[in-house]
Amino acid sequence: MRLRSTDSPLILIVAAALATSALALSNGAIGQGDAALAAVRRLDQASRTSNGELAPLSAEEHMRRAAIYFANRAFAEARAHWQALITRYPNDERVPAALFGIGRSFYQERRYAEALPFFEKLGRDYPNSREGRDGFYFVAPTLLRLGRAAEAASRYQAYIARFPAGERIADAYLNTIDTLREAGKPQEALDWIERTRQKFAGTPTATNALFAHLRLEISRGNWTKAVTLSDELLRSPLTGTMTSVAEVNYLRAYSLERLGNSAEAARIYQLIPDSIYSYYGWLATMRLMRLGQRAQAIARASRVRDQIRTSADFGETPYREIVLRVAKERGLDPRLILAIMRQESAFRPQARSRAAARGLMQLTIDIAQKYGPRANLSEVGEMDLYRPEISIQIAAAYLAELTKLFPQLPEAVVASYNGGEDNVARWLERSGKRDPGIFTAEIGFAETKDYVFKVMNYYRAYCTLYTAELLPQRPDEAQGASLPEKNASSIP
């Protein structure tokens, strides 16, 4: 459920940066699963000194154990080994990697104020190492998450000036644009859009900068300019970028709607194919209905409803009784829980991701320990997350909290479950809180964006096939033509 290593280059590609750091590569391929975690815990417990400190180990062994702990999100235990290495081997070549590990572990725990000094030290003391450059870079997203957007933008710009051939140079340009938007400096953001397009002309980075310009104008309600930019994007190759033809057409049609050109908007909406796996096609069908194009909307929805009913993918409702019970307790839609479960684990209770997410709902141990007490589970360990009832109970507690944060917008709830509610709050603010499709366009992580598309499509399918009690829908009651009413009500 947490952000993984395939994130987009658009704003805070944290996990990708961490996956490619020297720390992750310092010991080659090593086992980092549940068995490895249990083994290093036994070793540490058996060899601690009388005052409880870690036993003296080689620098390599400290790094090996820290990597295993970190891969399992046992952050405090990982930090103990990194700090031991720094203290015992201050001149070792692995010190920068250990410092970066400590910083990133605090970062992943959202302890940004504690992460910041480690990133600053890396950039200051080790600028010629990969960890030093990454540390310098990560000062920016850390400042952003501390609510210091203007300083964050300046730091991205400092990275560009100091490391013009740095590993994250394209990311720094793109992140500067969106961070300036968050700092309330749209004109400066426009200047950086032009710089980015010139420097990276003919590349996906330049196209992503153009897409950032489109999103900026939509957030400002500059609909005429948004239409012009949409047309320009549609003439550009979109492969390898953060957008698609369907998304750009949706944004173009939405902008035309806001300009009062309903006929042309309807024509563009009809160009977006609707299918069982087309999120923007689904939204386009809804917009057509609202524009009075009832016959076209019903025909599109009927085709998709037939696809869903003949698909073999949604014929069962696994763990129905548990899902219904916790959904009722938390005021959640059980069909959304099933949609998330399907995407997270394909209903496999023993599933485990590379990011140490476990079980049916792919919970990480830090989230489980935070929300376990709210599910009346006072002590939760890693292996408990493979138990279906525990996984569903804790996930429901978390989803209930997210639903309170983002009422009437399941896309934001789903995005939070994958990419973090702090990120979603920023994306929602940038979007202007207008429309689900506008919000989704602002999602800054490629994985999270794709995750939202998939989960919402599954949600549509389950709403078509099942009632809120997970009983089979009668054909005349199926609601595959639109989002559930609670979400549709948020669309102007």
Regions found by a protein language model. Give the residues of each.
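Short amphipathic alpha-helical/adjacent loop interface patches that line ligand
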Residues: 421, 459
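Acidic, polar-rich low-complexity tracts and alpha-helical solenoid repeat scaffolds
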Residues: 2-17, 21-386, 397-401, 405, ...
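Short loop-to-helix capping motifs
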Residues: 408-409, 420
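Active-site/ligand-binding surface loops and adjacent short beta/alpha elements
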Residues: 394
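Short, flexible loop segments at boundaries between secondary-structure elements
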Residues: 448-452
